[in-house]
Amino acid sequence: GDVYGGGSPTVIAFYENGIMEDRFGGYVISCEPARNVLFGYHPKTAGAGITLPQRDIFLTSNPEKNFAGADFARAGKINGLINLFRPSDVCIGPDGAIYVADWFDARVGGHGTRDMGQTGAIYRIAPKETKLSIPRVSINTIAGQIEALQNPSPNVRELGRSRLEKA
């Protein structure tokens, strides 16, 4: 794992293939809302386990690390959207893009929810000039099920895998 001090990691996604640059192949993306960041890792095998030898900043609204609204940053003050980027979920879409759910809450940790409007955003991360499309896959045939196994989205791959298992 990765020990970096106070925070509130919420979810990870494994980016295997898709439309992003090759350097993101095999990349683990971790949401950290208290630190306003998505961390990225290239896991390495170590015997029967794995290590995360280097932490990258994949995406952040707060490069100056002016943390506020987290249990470990009691003195910090919310500074607009810099501190309100709270990535709470990440997944890989069937189009190969990375999708990030962001919750605009002034507080993270404990039970101090302050977002009475329940506001947020979903961001799609993809190279600028990429034309995004969702491939049509028929999971009703064995050929389609095998094709689904090659999709960047683990959800689509699971559909193909579960149907193949029943075949």
Q: Where would I find each of the regions flagged by the language model?
A:
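Beta-propeller domains with acidic blade repeats across secreted/periplasmic ectodomains
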Residues: 1-145, 155-166
